[in-house]
């Protein structure tokens, strides 16, 4: 168990190596250069053994280790091919050489004076005969005589006496005397009334002018001594000694030391790369006038069969685009050449093996009908904190945290989106390996370690990975998790709509990524709170040009960025989806006031976090047939 724990913390420690400002793109097995004089190879952080020697010797720091990218579970770093310990060994040899030279300092003085008798036995015997000054006839030389003698040993020296205050002639202070019951004037049958710490290093405590009642001895009086020293109490402000309650001297002003400590903590967090904003007092507006209750909206939910009428003639014709769904077979870009698609360009129609769904209009798709069911409740979502990164409770009720069994405990390494009451949409690379089998899904939680009331943990019973997905490429990176039971919808748990239009949305729309992944590329701190970041779509030609500069893209993206993929990035290279956010949604916000949004993509992969290379996302609208065939088979939802 100790080895498992050590390995676990070692893996977590190696994740810190991704703080390097030098990003080298590659997959496992690709050659790389750690430094100009140190060759390397791209390996996972847990498989790199040589890096420990470089870090311990000081040859490299964590910020100097290049990153090759991210794998399914951990980061791929540029691992040195040559082991490092020469520096440490050199220091040890130098240290031992110094100590040996010091121990042999008197030997050079003996070399110029050669001794005529080189044999050590002859020399030692001669020295014993010449230097012997003891009488061999005395009793202590004969052990038998020593045992048989009856003579008492004579006292040859006086015993050492300890000095006293009288011999040292030092004045005696009255406070140095031990107190007695008579001096303290306390009854002997009531030992529990002794004052706390009455005798210490400074003598007896001064007597009190007024006696203290026995019911008020739960705290010490200020005049009993010095202030107690607070040792190893983290993140605590200095506090005053407890005093008796007095309404006249009650002070409501906070101590200035509290503000100083808060500023000190904020400064240290800013040095680590965190963004600390000053607190702002938001006045709470009390609504005195009664707000109009949503009386007409609940009446729409009385009829349980209303959501299933998705083929009626009386449906609003402007809710979804009227363009037909031409590509229903998901044969995405069969040509091997890189495809730079035009957002306004539509793909040619391919024959559909399913005759029941040929040229199905957008309005008749099960995903569109399911979205209308979700939005028919008439209950707006909670408004976001627009200028912040933290997501308010109820803003993204579709967010799901995927838990994996890691040495008997739950580890949340990927995210997902609840698209139906029993199905979660995520990335295929999050669930593709044996050690990445999801255990359960946590819904309705902002803090995944300390979830708020109302969250639900539902086991995963089935994993559906796209049949064309391969772990060696970035295409078809999409999967669906089936839950053991239906999620109970509430204000914080609700499915999300899927964006069904194949073309890119207008430029004035807002895009956000949300998740619990790495929030600081400097110290690799993982967020426990659901966060989001605003991104911009990157055109396909610019995205292909960026990925063409990465050597490993020739293997993982042989056809380039195709029409079933999206690219998004932050122009300032400060915000991005990072490790731990994989599988989460790329959210298209249509109206940030009433919370109308759709899921346009799934977080797939990227080269580093917040780099000049955009992040890669799986376009949801390209896989509607695949999703609907699992979630809503036979047009049932």
From Swiss-Prot:
Keywords: Disulfide bond, Hydrolase, Immunity, Melanin biosynthesis, Protease, Secreted, Serine protease, Signal. Residues 31-79 form the Clip domain. InterPro entries: CLIP, Peptidase_S1_PA, Peptidase_S1_PA_chymotrypsin, Peptidase_S1A, Trypsin_dom, TRYPSIN_HIS, TRYPSIN_SER. Residues 245-260 have a biased composition (Low complexity). Its EC number is 3.4.21.-. Its main location: secreted. Belongs to the peptidase S1 family. CLIP subfamily. Residues 1-26 form the signal peptide. Disulfide bonds join 32-78, 42-68, 48-79, 371-497, 414-430, 543-567, 578-609. This is Serine protease Hayan. Induction: Up-regulated after wounding to the integument. Levels are higher with septic wounding, using either Gram-negative or Gram-positive bacteria. It comes from the Eukaryota. Residues 234-244, 321-332 have a biased composition (Polar residues). The keyword Protein transport does not apply. It comes from Drosophila melanogaster. Pfam families: Trypsin. It is found in: Secreted. One of its GO terms (biological process) is positive regulation of melanization defense response. The gene is Hayan. The clip domain consists of 35-55 residues which are 'knitted' together usually by 3 conserved disulfide bonds forming a clip-like compact structure.
């Amino acid at each position: 168990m100790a080895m498992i724990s050590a390995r676990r913390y070692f893996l977590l420690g190696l994740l810190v190596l991704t703080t390097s400002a030098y990003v080298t793109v590659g997959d496992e097995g690709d050659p790389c250069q750690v430094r100009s004089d140190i060759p390397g190879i791209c390996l996972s952080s847990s498989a790199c053994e040589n890096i420990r020697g470089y870090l311990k010797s000081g040859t490299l720091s964590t910020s100097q280790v290049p990153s090759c990218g991210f794998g399914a579970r951990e980061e791929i770093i540029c691992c040195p091919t040559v082991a490092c310990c020469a520096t440490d060994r050199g220091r040890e040899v130098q240290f031992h050489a110094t100590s040996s030279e010091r121990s042999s300092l008197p030997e050079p003085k003996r070399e110029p004076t050669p001794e005529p008798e080189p044999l050590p036995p002859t020399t030692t015997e001669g020295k014993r005969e010449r230097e012997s000054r003891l009488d061999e006839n005395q009793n202590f030389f004969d052990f038998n005589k020593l045992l048989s003698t009856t003579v008492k040993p004579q006292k040859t020296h006086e015993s050492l006496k300890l000095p006293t205050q009288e011999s040292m002639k030092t004045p005696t202070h009255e406070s140095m005397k031990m107190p007695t019951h008579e001096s303290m004037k306390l009854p002997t049958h009531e030992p529990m009334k002794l004052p706390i710490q009455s005798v210490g290093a400074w003598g007896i405590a001064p007597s009190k002018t007024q006696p203290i009642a026995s019911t008020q001895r739960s705290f010490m009086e200020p005049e009993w001594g010095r202030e107690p020293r607070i040792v190893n109490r983290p993140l605590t402000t200095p506090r005053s000694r407890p005093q008796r309650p007095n309404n006249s001297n009650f002070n409501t002003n906070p101590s200035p030391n509290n503000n100083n400590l808060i500023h000190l903590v904020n400064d240290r967090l800013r040095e680590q790369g965190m963004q600390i904003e000053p607190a702002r007092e938001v006045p709470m507006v009390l609504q005195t006038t009664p707000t109009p209750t949503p009386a007409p909206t609940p009446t729409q939910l009385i009829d349980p069969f209303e959501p299933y009428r998705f083929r009626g003639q009386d449906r609003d014709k402007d809710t979804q685009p009227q363009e037909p769904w031409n590509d229903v077979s998901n044969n995405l870009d069969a040509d091997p050449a890189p495809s730079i698609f035009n957002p306004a360009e539509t793909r040619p129609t391919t024959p559909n093996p399913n005759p029941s769904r040929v040229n199905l209009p957008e309005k008749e798709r099960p995903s569109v009908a399911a979205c209308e069911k979700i939005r028919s409740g008439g209950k707006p979502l909670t408004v976001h904190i627009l200028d912040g990164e933290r997501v308010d409770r109820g803003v993204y009720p579709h967010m799901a945290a995927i838990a994996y069994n890691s040495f008997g405990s739950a580890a949340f390494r990927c995210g997902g989106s609840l698209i139906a009451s029993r199905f979660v949409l995520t990335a295929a690379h999050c669930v593709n390996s044996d050690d990445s089998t999801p255990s359960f899904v946590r819904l309705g939680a902002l803090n995944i370690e300390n979830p708020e009331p109302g969250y639900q943990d539902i086991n995963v019973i089935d994993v559906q990975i796209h049949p064309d997905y391969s772990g060696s490429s970035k295409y078809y990176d999409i999967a669906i998790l089936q839950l053991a039971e239906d999620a109970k919808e509430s204000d914080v748990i609700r499915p999300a709509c899927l964006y069904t239009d194949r073309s890119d949305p207008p430029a004035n729309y807002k895009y956000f990524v949300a998740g619990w992944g790495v929030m600081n590329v400097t110290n690799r701190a993982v967020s426990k709170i659901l966060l989001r970041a605003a991104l911009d779509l990157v055109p396909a030609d610019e995205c292909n040009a960026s990925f063409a500069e990465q050597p490993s893209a020739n293997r993982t993206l042989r056809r380039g960025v195709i029409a079933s993929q999206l690219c998004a990035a932050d122009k300032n290279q400060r915000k991005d989806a990072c490790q731990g956010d994989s599988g989460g949604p790329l959210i298209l916000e249509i109206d940030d006031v009433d919370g109308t949004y759709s899921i346009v993509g799934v977080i797939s992969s990227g080269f580093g976090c917040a780099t000049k290379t955009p992040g890669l996302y799986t376009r949801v609208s390209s896989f509607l047939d695949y999703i609907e065939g699992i979630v809503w088979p036979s047009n049932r939802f």
